[in-house]
Curated annotation (Swiss-Prot):
It catalyses: a quinone + NADH + 5 H(+)(in) = a quinol + NAD(+) + 4 H(+)(out). It comes from the Bacteria. The keyword Translocase applies. This is NADH-quinone oxidoreductase subunit C. One of its GO terms (molecular function) is quinone binding.
Amino acid sequence: MSRFTYAYMMMTRLETLKNNLQAAFGQDLALTESLGELTLEVAAEQWFSACTKLRTDPALRFESCIDLCGVDYLTWGNGTQPEEKTGPVTHGRYAVVVHLLSIEHNWRLRVRTWAPDDEFPMVSSLLECWPGVNWFEREAFDLYGIVFEGHPDLRRILTDYGFIGHPFRKDFPLSGTVEMRYDPEQKRVIYQPVTIDPREITPRVVREGSYGMGR
């Protein structure tokens, strides 16, 4: 099979998926395409029902959820330089994203929803739709503080017992808030406030005065 033939087949499959999504969601469809990938935007109140339709509709059949993750858009659009600023995101601060795979039809889809409340981000759990997202949702809760309504065991899964905060949030301090050390008097590991002093390191470059001359 030539490279051109393969690319044509992929584009044809992508167009078929677009048409099937249009037929399934009608006027509610919010679809974007970039780099040969499709992203479906879903309102938070339709999150569970839309994902259920993606799994059960014979024309879609996304029977496998490859990944679920949280995203914090707090600094989205700021850029590393002032001239790179593109403006803040127009939706909420927190999003939940799933990557789906249809083994039957051999196509993929990214689906994203936005938590409506930045202070208490919450969306419906997809555990009844794809049981494999159990620990994915616990991870997003642990790292971002996103609550998945209906999850039967929404506990932290990566951070330590008694951890305060959510370390993947953009406003969480890079050095953390506490550190661990062994206390010889208590003969156990204890927590204490972070003792790292924040500092900015500027590299120093030293060159000879004639560096680069005559080249």
